[in-house]
């Protein structure tokens, strides 16, 4: 079942007001993250973690599996929806959180970034790899929004804030004129402020 939506005041993003509860035993998200399920195209999570940068750029339907959200994807109708049961499982299971960090690290490396704890910085390959996504309206900006939202929902808010801080710094330097203000607003709306 799909979640029920209501608009909120925060950058006109949907606020989830109710979820259909999915048993953790049958959840496609948890089966995928635990390595017992595949995405709609067939690969298991460990196979995706082994993909090279070219494949990560060319394949579009895996990102909704690595970083699932409660909202249906307009680009991938077969993508699973993140449920409250899934979120609770990520909160409770350190192994699931570590696997989510591994998915994050995969995408950070693809973008030329790296993570140390919750801090995200430019990696050695940033100048070369940023050329592939540091341009106005690049589809990887949508991927980054999805990543930030997912991390914020599964108790990895520190990592989400670290990624956002790095993206804001990039937007003020190498990304000036390449990362649109609207994109920055979506990224900021995706990450809760520290308490």
Where are these regions (language model features)?
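N-terminal leader regions that mediate targeting or early regulatory function
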Residues: 19-124, 158
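Alpha-helical bundle/repeat cores within regulatory domains of eukaryotic proteins
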Residues: 120-195
